[in-house]
Each structure stands twice: as C-alpha cells, then as structure tokens.
From Swiss-Prot:
It comes from Rattus norvegicus. It is a single-pass type IV membrane protein. This is BET1-like protein. Residues 108-111 are vesicular. Keywords: Coiled coil, Golgi apparatus, Membrane, Phosphoprotein, Protein transport, Transmembrane, Transmembrane helix, Transport. The chain crosses the membrane at residues 87-107. The keyword Lipid metabolism does not apply. The modification Phosphoserine is found at residues 9, 37. InterPro entries: BET1_SNARE (IPR039899), T_SNARE_dom (IPR000727). One of its GO terms (biological process) is retrograde transport, endosome to Golgi. The gene is Bet1l. Vesicle SNARE required for targeting and fusion of retrograde transport vesicles with the Golgi complex. Required for the integrity of the Golgi complex.
Length: 111
C-alpha cells in the first residue's frame, strides 16, 4: 500500500512540475514576443532616422555648394581693387547698422 501512495504522490508532483513548466514556457514565449516587437520597432525607427540623415546630407551638400560659390565671388570682389574695397566696406557698415536697427525694432515689438 505504501508503494501505491508514493506512486500517487510522485504523479501529483510531476503534474505540478509539468504545470509550472508550461506556465513558465508561456511566460517566456510572451517575453520573447515582446522583445521581437521591440526589435522590429527599433529597426523601423533606425531606417527612418537613416532616411532623415541622408536627406540632411544632401541638403548640407547643396548648401556647401552655394556657400563655396558665394565665398569665391566675395573673394573676387575683394581682390578687384581699391574702389571696390571702399564700396564693400560701405556695404558692410550699412548691413551692420541695418541689423542693429532691425534687432532694436523687433525687441521693441516683443515688449
């Protein structure tokens, strides 16, 4: 009779252990699914950011081209002669004064 009771209790223990294993396997599967979803979200976000950076690269390239051309033209004007230098200095002074006047007017309109 003792052997039969032992067999019955070991069967109950096996059943409890089996249920616990199934519960833990389901929990693990849920965590793996969440991790997979996070990995896919990170992948999508990375692709979006790469596209954005590629767009910025082309924008910076075009701006660099524009600035290079402007600097070359400015250098040519600066080298061309004394009269041009006087004109260039006068234009610079006018632009600086206009900047200060506009900044003063904008600060007055904000308050």
């Amino acid at each position: 009779m003792a052997d039969w009771t032992r067999a019955q209790s070991s069967g109950a223990v096996e059943e409890i252990v089996d249920r616990e294993n199934k519960r833990m396997a389901d929990s693990l599967a849920s965590k793996v699914t969440r991790l997979k979803s996070l990995a896919l979200d990170i992948d999508r976000d990375t692709e979006d950011q790469n596209r954005y950076l590629d767009g910025m690269d082309s924008d910076f390239t075009s701006v660099t081209g524009l600035l290079t051309g402007s600097v070359k033209r400015f250098s040519t004007v600066a080298r061309s002669g004394r009269d041009t230098r006087k004109l260039l200095c006068g234009m610079a002074v006018v632009l600086i004064v206009a900047f200060f006047i506009l900044s003063y007017l904008f600060s007055r309109t904000r308050t």
